[in-house]
Structures are given as structure tokens and as C-alpha cells.
Amino acid sequence: DTSPTLTVDSALAKQSFVRPTHEFGQGNVEQQMADATHKASGTLSIGGQEHMYLEGQVSLAIPDEDDRMKIYTSSQHPSEVQKLVAEVLDVKLHRVMVDMRRMGGGFGGKETQAAQWACIAALLASRNHCAVKCRLPRQVDMHVTGKRHPFENRFEVGFDDTGRILATHMDINGNCGHSPDLSDAIVDRAMFHADNGYYLGASHIVGHRLKTNMVSHTAYRGFGGPQGMIMAEALIDKVARHLEVDPLTIRKRNLYGESTGTVTPYGMEVEHNLLPEIMTKLETDGHYWARRKAITAFNRNSPVIKKGLALTPVKFGISFTAKHLNQAGALVHIYTDGSIQVNHGGTEMGQGLHTKIGQIAANEFGLSVDMIEVTATRTDKVPNTSPTAASSGTDLNGKAVQNACITLTTRLAECFAASLGMADQANMVRFEHGNVILGEHSKPFAELVQAAYFERVSLSASGFYKTPKLHYNRDTGEGRPFFYFAYGASLSEVSIDTLTGEYTVDRVDILHDVGDSLNPAIDKGQIEGAFIQGMGWLTTEDLRWNEAGKLISENMATYKIPAIGDTPKHFDVQLFGRKNAEDSIYHSKAVGEPPFMLAISVWCALKDAISSLSGYKLAPQLDTPATPERVLNAVLAAQGQ
């Protein structure tokens, strides 16, 4: 058979995989499923997503003496670019320097797939002994780069009369394209998040990595988590409609906790669980039940426009699932005028990483942020870096920078205390408001730095951090792949036109856990942006390929990302102010990816509006993206029911 393999089903039929299947679970699923009073099953086709970064793929290669090469690239992973360029040029890594000042957006699309353009530029620069820039036009960029993995998933669930889940089986099937890229880790994360915030009872989760004749799909914000998490919400909706109970009641009834269970299907204890508190607070502050009553009455009296309401949780694991990537380095210099330069391994792509890193350094030295310069990410300053991905940028690099700063403040404190004849009190020295203080003695920071220089104290230090507590055994399917979980909840209200399938998102209320926020303005911006991007994935962003596997939604005219008019009329984001119980940087939490999945509440609200046509007895089949066409088809199916 030489016909192209473009779908999960056709790849499964051909047993075409890019990587081996993985599975894990707990309990006796067959027995619990057989004993369950009620059973339900379902399938869901989940679309991919184009990254649509503002700046496309671009690299500049400049040859230097002795076979050295300088690379300026738009990449989330400078060390991988360095490694691959060195392989292409057949030189050692120390001959290649990669400089990354900032990207015009990345979202995962420049984690691995930026490297090939740097390699092409470097090869041509080496052969022709001149600088070469390789930049892709937007349409070419869309054709040749990988997307978010499309998935086609299946579930079966057994539950009791109250809606308590007793047994779950899930098949998580990722369309990986023609090569593995990061698909192993992406399908793993989809499996790790197939429970979302719910205890699934006895469970068995299988993850297939399917090979198809498409571009090699790659990382995208959430990294498989959204494609797994949406299955948990589809499952909950199915249970709720089967029992004719409000979905929020079923959601709260199955949250991890003492009355259900606290261990995930992969054997990790859910500690410091904030979801019950977050959901109850949003339920109250968002007036869920009053609005549910009003919407039910509205739908009863409105023949064409139907409203939907949904409150959904997010529980997202923070750490790279590949353990070795959970490390970071930093290099901090203090100059004799008291100014400070910070180098670290993270990359800035508009998410505010350098701003937070600058704040951390300023706080450690007791200085204003204008005394801190965060440099470009360079492989000759901090080597062997991990990609800026998995929401880990601040967690890893912030801790590494803090480690270097503590080394330097310790040296300066010892120098200051010794100069006062109080060497035994060096641990009492404080760095505050541009001054160094010990008891009644105080000296401006810049003066102490100058004095330390004359005392031959080193004013440069490297820092390092590795995330603790991580382990996972693929053979047994058990471990702790995440340092902690970030939590959140979203309450969305929508209106659909049952004649056309068109809809509006009328109101969104979000309560999200970022620990003790390093920068509330940045964190709120990340939550808002992630939500809108997630909403686009679930509603308007429709990737289409022809029968030969060629992308035909290849430009901004045929591929619709959310516009300003798609922003909810009422859009309220609140931070849940609770310190991270784990020892993260200043007890903050990662914020890059978790809010993306808050947008699942919009998809659930659309289904809720459609379900009203059946008296809330039907869980409509609504594959993603839920375009107006798909919504209309679901409406017609509900009306026919």
C-alpha cells in the first residue's frame, strides 16, 4: 500500500509507529469496570495548531578564524543548535558559539525546529567564507515546520450512581508525523495529564506514537498536556449527562482528595492539592449556580440563541519529563562600579524571563533593577543548557542565578565583616536598598565592591541548580516525574446561534495558582495570553491537509488565530495567592503553560449550550477545533436526537 498515511486510524491499522508504545496504570481495571453500575465510552479527535510566532524561523551564521562559527539564531535551545552545527561542520563544540538575544515568539516551535536553519546557514557560510542569513517566508515556514500534535483518543469509564469514577481505560494516540522529534515526551505528557485533577479509580492508560506522512510534529505550549487533559473533561461531561447531573457537581466529586484517592495512575502522590479550594472559590465568586439557573431559564425561552456555562480545573505537572534536562547554569559578574551582569541559560521569547531573572538578582544584592544587566543567552558564557521549555525557564535559571548571587554576597559579606573586625558575624550582613549593613555599620554597595576588588576578592561566580525529587521508571510506569503541580480553574460562558453554529465567548473568570508571584503583571499577562491561545486551538485554528499530506491552510487568510474581537467581553483574571510548598525560586510557580488549558472551559461551555437542546441529557460529540461548522453539525445532531 503506497497511499499516504495521514490519520491515526490508518497508522494504527498499519501498525506504523515512530517510537514504542508506553502504558501505565493502577488497580484492577477489568474487575472494577465489570462491577460498575454505569459505563460510558467516547472518542475525541483533537486538532493540531500552528505556532504563528510573530518572527519566523531565522538564523545568521558568521564564519570566524580557525574554523570557528558564530550563530545568531531565533531558538529556544541554543545548546542544541551549537551541537548540530558542530556536527554538520565536523568541528568540536567549542568552535561554535550561539548567541540568542531574544525571539519574536516561540511557543515550542523553536525548541528543536530552529536548528536546521542554523545548520543550513552555517554550512553555506563555511563553504563560501562569508556571512549567511537563512530566513523563511511565512508560507514556507508554515509548510515545512511541525505543529502541535493532533490526537485521536478513546476512553471507557465505569462509575456509580453518584458519578464517582471507579475504573478508566484510555487510548492516547498522537499523530507524530514522519519522525520522532519530541513525540516520545509529548505523548508521555499527554498520558500524565489524562487524569487532569481527577482520581480515575482503577486505571489503564496507553500511549501510541503514530507515524504518518506529514511534517514531523513538535513541541507546542502545553507539550501534550492539553491533548491529554481534554480527555478527562470529555469523560466527566459524559458521566454528568448520563446521570443528568450538573457537570460541576461531578467534577468536584471526583477531584483528588481523601474521599477519592491521592495517587495518580503513574504512582505520584498529589501533594499540596489546591484544586478543591480554587474551584469552590471560583464557583462562589463567579456566582456559578445563580448563573446556571438564569442560563437554564434563558435557554428555555430562547429558540435560536443558546447559552452554555462550564467551570473546569487544571492540574499541570512542572518539570521536564526527561530528568536530565532539569538543570541550569548561570554566570554572574560584579563590576567595580557596582553594576552587575547576569548570564544564564534561559532564552527570552517575550515571556518576561529576563525581567524576572533581573528581579531575582536585584533582590539578592539589595539593588534596584537598573543596576542589573541580563545578557543575551550565549553558549560560551553558560554551556550545556536545557531548552527554555516545559514552563521551567524561571524555576531552573532563577535558582541557578540565585545560587551564583549567594556565592558573591557571601564573599562580599565576609570582606565587609572582616574590614570591621567582626569576621565572626559575616552571616549577619544584610544587602538592602543599595547598601551593605552589619549592625550599626553601613556602606554603599558600590564602595564595598571597590574595596573587595582591592582585597583581591573574586567578583565573578557561576551558579548551578538541579530540580530535586524527580524519578520515573518507564518499565514499571511509576515515579515522580514532576517537582510540583500548578493549579487553576476557569469559568466560561458562551452563546451559540443554532441556525449558523456561530458563537461568542461572553464571559471568562479565571483563578490561577502561581505561588508567590515574582511579577504579577507578567503572570497575569501570561495567563491571559495562554487562555486566548488555548481558545484559538479549541475553536478557530483549523489545520487542513490535502490527500497527499500537503498543508492547505498555509497562510493567515486560511488559518484563523484569535483576533482582538474574539476576546471575551468580560475577562477577569485573579491570582490565587498561596506560596508554593516546594522550594522553588521564592516559592513561586511556573506560569507559561498551565493557563493554556484553562481554555478547555470554553469548549465545555459550547458543549453545554448544545446539550441544552436535549434537555441536558446528551453529551454532544464535538471534535476540536470546534469551528462554527462543527458546532452546527453538533446542534443538528442534538436536535435530531
Where in this protein do the model-derived segments appear?
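Structural alpha/beta core scaffold segments of enzyme domains
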Residues: 1-511, 572, 601-614, 634-641
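Amphipathic, heptad-repeat alpha-helical segments used for oligomerization and assembly
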Residues: 223, 388, 392, 582-594
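Generic long, charged, amphipathic alpha-helical segments
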Residues: 373, 562-587
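Conserved phosphate-binding loops in nucleotide/dinucleotide-binding enzymes
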Residues: 517-532, 625
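Extracellular/periplasmic helix-exit of transmembrane alpha-helices
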Residues: 540-553
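C-terminal structured "cap/appendage" subdomains that terminate the fold
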Residues: 586-603, 607-614, 619-620
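Short, highly charged C-terminal tails/helix-capping segments
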Residues: 620-636
